[in-house]
Design a protein with these regions (language model features):
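Short membrane-interface helical motifs at transmembrane helix boundaries
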Residues: 48-75
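Alpha-helical transmembrane segments of multi-pass membrane proteins
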Residues: 2-4, 68-94, 120
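Small-residue-rich hydrophobic transmembrane alpha-helices
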Residues: 1-51, 55, 91-102, 106
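Transmembrane helix-loop junctions in multipass membrane proteins, especially transporters and channels
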Residues: 14, 58-67, 97, 101-104, ...
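Membrane-embedded alpha-helical transmembrane segments of multi-pass integral membrane proteins
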Residues: 49, 88-91, 145-149
Length: 164
């Protein structure tokens, strides 16, 4: 799963660089168009990664263990991870875009809001004894909360400031 995060983080780095360059050149309209294109690439790459992970879920866990109890827990968790990937692709891109735009203050506040959503979900999993798959489902709630806060910011356009 860390390997997927590294691949998605590469999209964030590209988003930072391209956004900084485009806004630095004073091209707000081009930056917005570039952002939409990168969001599509993020969703597409995340979707492809999710499908690959989904197709390989029964085999991936076997690379690490033969213990039947671990395999029984791992495969549904890997499926949950796979479902999250398309959302994660867009989240990573928008993180990069907003970092490249110098919108760190918004990202900090959005992070607190996301934590306010995720913490009860994660604690609830532990309290209810939900197990590994439900912990990944809770993490999906974290990703969804991040996606919503980032898309709201992308749509309002206040991040696209030249000369910042």
């Amino acid at each position: 799963m860390t390997l997927l995060a590294f691949a998605l983080d590469a999209l964030a780095i590209a988003g930072q660089t391209l956004t900084g360059r485009s806004l630095g050149a004073g091209d707000v309209v081009g930056t917005r168009a570039l952002t939409r294109r990168m969001m599509a690439w993020g969703a597409g790459f995340g979707g492809a990664a999710g499908l690959l992970l989904l197709a390989s879920a029964p085999f991936v866990a076997r690379l690490f263990t033969t213990d039947p109890a671990v395999l029984d827990a791992a495969v549904p968790a890997i499926v949950a991870i796979a479902v999250i990937q398309p959302l994660s692709g867009v989240v990573f891109v928008l993180d990069g875009v907003l970092i490249g735009a110098g919108d760190g203050a918004y990202l900090a506040w959005a992070g607190l809001l996301t934590l306010a959503v995720y913490a009860p979900l994660a604690v609830g999993v532990g309290w209810a004894g939900g197990g590994l798959t439900w912990l990944w489902v809770a993490y999906g709630g974290f990703i969804l909360a991040r996606l919503l806060t980032l898309v709201v910011r992308e749509r309002d356009g206040r991040w696209a400031v030249t000369g910042a």
